[in-house]
Amino acid sequence: MDKREQYIDKQIIEQIMELRKQLHRIPEHSMQEVKTKQLLMDFLKSHTALEIVDCGAWFYAVKRAYDRVTTENDKTFHVSEVAVEIPEQMTEYKPPIAFRADMDAVCGKDGKPGHFCGHDGHSSVLCGLGLYLDSRKEPLAQDVYLIFQPAEEIGKGAELCRSLIKEKHIGEIYGFHNIPGKPLGTVLVKDGTFACASTGLEIHMTGTPSHAAYPEAGRNPG
């Protein structure tokens, strides 16, 4: 048995591997992820019953938990028109959580986009999570949002998704970055900030140029 099947269904593995190959063939620059977004949305629509919301430059999918119904023993949740009994530990309200993946490609030295940073893999894995959640028979304790973020490479995509976090009162967001070469099933974590990036730095300096033969005519910038 493929060791990966210890963690996830073989059919889901095959589906997300094929999806990654398709995404790898259509890399797009930040804020231009038109084909990428459409492919991901079409995939989830074709393979799941998740609620999908198109937000223009990005989108999200939702796996809903059972809507709560107040009952005498406070253990009954309601789905459509069918009431079901669920375990006692799942009766408490929990705020929604989210999982996030980036969609954009890196701009190569030739100016063309390419998935050199693995965002095709990130988006495929998030779709795989969607497949898994959709296949679950057990009720969820909270709504789960899958956020497909654009423009991670230029630092603009997260800002676009902030409104959803506030509007839906999402309490926690999870994301990851693939790191090839590590053993299968390994998750690397670190206390505190990890892999933070600069948002950019501009320095303005004023001076007077001159020829090296006449340094006294120039003024060092300051």
Say what each PLM segment does.
Residues D2-F116, D120-L131, S135-L140:
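Acidic/His- and Gly-rich active-site-bordering loop/insert found
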